[in-house]
From Swiss-Prot:
Subcellular location(s) of the protein: Vacuole, Aleurone grain; Endoplasmic reticulum; Protein storage vacuole
Compositional bias of kind Low complexity: 117-133
Pfam families from the UniProt entry: Cupin_1
Name of protein: Glycinin G5
Expression across tissues: Exclusively in seeds during embryogenesis.
Protein family per UniProt: Belongs to the 11S seed storage protein (globulins) family.
Quaternary structure note: Hexamer; each subunit is composed of an acidic and a basic chain derived from a single precursor and linked by a disulfide bond.
Biased composition (Basic and acidic residues): 247-260, 317-337
UniProtKB keywords: Allergen, Disulfide bond, Endoplasmic reticulum, Glycoprotein, Seed storage protein, Signal, Storage protein, Vacuole
Organism: Glycine max (Soybean)
Taxonomic lineage of the native organism: Eukaryota, Viridiplantae, Streptophyta, Embryophyta, Tracheophyta
Length: 516
């Protein structure tokens, strides 16, 4: 008779302990955002490579722990290439300067860019057949483009322009798909990269500080960095990839000192319509002037920024609030679902998913005041892939002394990165200004969910981007709240006369942008 009671009591005790543990974890997470003071953060760590620079923010800052993100900034010099890597969480990249190319390696997707086999002949020898190259689609990006990187998918980037590419990336370490902890990690497939987030390594060292000599040697190897291939022996790699040991040793890259960003001597040559079009133009010019066409240059020159935007607009699907500026292509107008002509739905969603959108074009603005500035919003409604990432973005340009009126985030934390200089004020639930100061270029500011925030441009204006931790982040503007509340409620709430209430509700701009 006592056994069922004992079993029930034991089950109840386990359930109580589990509930207490979950409550403690949840409470700890909530307490991370009980911040009485916010700080403008600057990069804490730099990794200088052969072809560029990587700057990172310490993820242990209370503000970043509250938002569940960390941030990195990459600078790719001319002909600089960021080595293939992947992350255990999604990331969003905004290009604040320059132009380039990005390639992904989606698992299970075909190589849709192919170079046909060609016959090459040499004097005194028979014709030889060159090996064929093929790879997945390459996407081109420009200044103002927002790129989204799926978790676990390898990608690489390359600077195709003459000026450095500068890109800022929030890393959503608290994403529910990340089965590790919230410490930032980058898994490189090539090179001998340096540690980008030393705080992660420091925590691991503290956890292993009680280990013996063997663990100490292991920690020393971890501090030196390396790609995921460097942990395998060259003999094993040679067997796995069916190659010789010399090639396998280069895959391990034990002595490569170029680090994360390398310089491609002579420029990168890949299969891409954009590369090929420029090469054909160069050959046509040579024939026109009677010159013998030379071999295609390895480093392509590229068209103007407007040409890149036109290409992006052709690839974009029409948005309800932004109709296309040119007619759709015939293949886009054909109805789908006709028997065998229907393409694989999984392939369309994964292999050909749209992963970038320009957010900085003036024609892209959702709010505009010719005397105050403009606002552009990017969320899962305008870029459906963001629904899987749980991120969104907002691009704001404030003209001289222009004001972004007070608002708050209903369902997201936000990370603000500036390109100019302006004043920001954040007020918490107690009516205290947890931040009231100037935000300069290169700094970031984390604003938790619900505190009211307002921005004002300086004498030279203010340009900034806001990353938000929800795929469809919603903001509520205090001016809009005044408009929808009955006059009597406002009169009694603020002790105002009717004329003052009418002035408060209906005088001035109806949108969030204000010119003082």
């Amino acid at each position: 008779m006592g056994k069922p009671f004992f079993t029930l009591s034991l089950s109840s005790l386990c359930l109580l302990l589990l509930s207490s543990a979950c409550f403690a974890i949840t409470s700890s997470k909530f307490n991370e955002c009980q911040l009485n003071n916010l700080n403008a953060l600057e990069p804490d760590h730099r990794v200088e490579s052969e072809g560029g620079l990587i700057e990172t923010w310490n993820s242990q800052h209370p503000e970043l722990q509250c938002a569940g993100v960390t941030v990195s900034k990459r600078t790719l010099n001319r002909n600089g290439s960021h080595l293939p890597s992947y992350l255990p969480y999604p990331q969003m990249i905004i290009v604040v300067q320059g132009k380039g190319a990005i390639g992904f390696a989606f698992p299970g997707c075909p190589e849709t860019f192919e170079k046909p086999q060609q016959q090459s002949s040499r004097r005194g020898s028979r014709s030889q057949q060159q090996l064929q190259d093929s790879h997945q689609k390459i996407r081109h990006f420009n200044e103002g483009d927002v790129l989204v990187i799926p978790l676990g998918v390898p990608y690489w980037t390359y600077n195709t322009g003459d000026e450095p590419v500068v890109a800022i990336s929030p890393l959503d370490t608290s994403n529910f798909n990340n089965q590790l902890d919230q410490n930032p990690r980058v898994f490189y497939l090539a090179g001998n990269p340096d540690i980008e987030h030393p705080e992660t390594m420091q925590q691991q060292q503290q956890q292993k500080s009680h280990g013996g000599r063997k663990q100490g040697q292991h920690r020393q190897q971890e501090e030196e960095g390396g790609s995921v291939l460097s942990g395998f022996s060259k003999h094993f790699l040679a067997q796995s990839f069916n190659t010789n040991e010399d090639t396998a040793e280069k895959l391990r890259s034990p002595d490569d000192e170029r680090k994360q960003i390398v310089t491609v001597e002579g420029g990168l040559s890949v299969i891409s319509p954009k590369w090929q079009e420029q090469e054909d133009e160069d050959e046509d010019e040579d024939e026109e002037y009677g010159r013998t066409p030379s071999y295609p240059p390895r480093r392509p020159s590229h068209g103007k920024h407007e040409d890149d935007e036109d290409e992006d607009e052709e690839e974009d699907q029409p948005r309800p609030d932004h109709p296309p500026q040119r007619p759709s292509r015939p293949e886009q107008q054909e109805p789908r679902g006709r028997g065998c002509q229907t393409r694989n739905g999984v392939e369309e969603n994964i292999c050909t998913m749209k992963l970038h959108e320009n957010i900085a074009r003036p024609s892209r603005a959702d709010f505009y005041n010719p005397k105050a500035g403009r606002i552009s919003t990017l969320n899962s409604l305008t870029l459906p892939a963001l629904r899987q990432f749980g991120l969104s973005a907002q691009y704001v340009v404030l003209y001289r002394n222009g004001i972004y009126s007070p608002d708050w985030n209903l369902n997201a934390n936000s990370v603000t990165m500036t390109r100019g200089k302006g004043r920001v004020r954040v007020v918490n639930c107690q009516g205290n200004a947890v931040f009231d100061g100037e935000l300069r270029r290169g700094q970031l500011l984390v604003v938790p969910q619900n505190p009211a925030v307002a921005e004002q441009g300086g004498e030279q204006g203010l340009e900034y981007v806001v990353f938000k931790t929800h795929h469809n982040a919603v903001s509520s503007y205090i001016k809009d709240v005044f408009r929808v509340i009955p006059s009597e409620v406002l009169s009694n709430s603020y002790n105002l006369g009717q004329s003052q209430v009418r002035q408060l509700k209906y005088q001035g701009n109806s949108g969030p942008l204000v010119n003082p």
